[in-house]
Each structure stands twice: as C-alpha cells, then as structure tokens.
Amino acid sequence: YQLTKDHAFKTDYSNASRTQMFNVSALDWDEELISLFGIKKEMLAEICDSNALYGYTDFDGYLEEAIPIHGVMGDSHGALYGQGCVNPGMIKATYGTGSSIMMNVGEKPIFSDKGVVTSLAWSLSGKVNYVLEGNINYTGAVITWLQKDLGLIASAKETEELAKSANPGDTTYL
C-alpha cells in the first residue's frame, strides 16, 4: 500500500491465508470470522495472484520512473518457491529468529490434526498451491535471550564451542 503511495490496497493468497481471517478452501475472506471481529470485507485488502500487478512505485522519488510491482509472497512461502520446492512433496527448512518446516502439498488443501498449519503457498496466474507448515517462533532468537537476559554467554559465537563440547548421548533441556 505504501509502495504504491496509497493507490493499491492488495495482498496475495499466501499473506491472506496467515491472517486467521481467510478461508483456505473458499479462497476468500471468511465472512463468519471477520464478522466476529466487527470487520467489513471492504476494509480488507484485495486478494491477488502472487504474480499479479500490484501497482507501481518510484520508491519515493529515488527512481526517475515508476516500476511495476509484480511479486508478492509471504516470507516462508517465498523461501519455499526460491528454494525450488514447486512440486507436491517438496520440503524446505528455514532457520532464523524462528524456524519453519514447510511442505508443498499441491493444488488441494490437506488439513492436519498434528499441529501443522494449512495455508496457501502462492497463486500464480490463477493456479494455487497449498502448504503444510510447522513453526517454532523463537529458535534463533534464543541466543539473544541466553546472552542478554540470562547472561549465560558473552557472545553468540560461544554457542559453537558449547555445542561441540556437548555429549550427544546426554539429555539437554532448554
């Protein structure tokens, strides 16, 4: 929205599916859920294909001419696509502040009762792909917690030596 200087209020299916207000089966905002929050559908972004034209930007005048914005995708979803996991059964793992294991399940959603989330991977030219994803929200950020909050390490680099000194047969709790 800001990149287009308030001209386009749009999102893609991958981001919409993460709001908890999107029906992944109907591929639209869920009327029942949004009404629970007192939200009108008109207040929500238009949902577009990931490769749709979202508008134009000149980056607040840094470019002489505005350029088109054509690629919008959630971060983990973009990582899945960027790592070439474009076919059903292909999986990627991302480790950072949080961690994500995501599997492309193809053109039909699969719902699990095992704690993984069903969402849209992307929609390219009208064709959607679904994913199953397991998240750990605070994995890489735990290093900062060990250092700054608990004072157990002086730097992130220390964790390498600690890991090397650990006995794989020992039980570790964190």
Positions of predicted regions on the chain:
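Active-site core segments that coordinate phosphate-bearing ligands/cofactors
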Residues: Y1-K10, N15-A16, Q20-E31, S35-L36, ...
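A generic structural-conservation signal
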Residues: E42-M43, A156
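Short helix-boundary/re-entrant hairpin motifs in multi-pass inner-membrane proteins
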Residues: G38, L44-A45
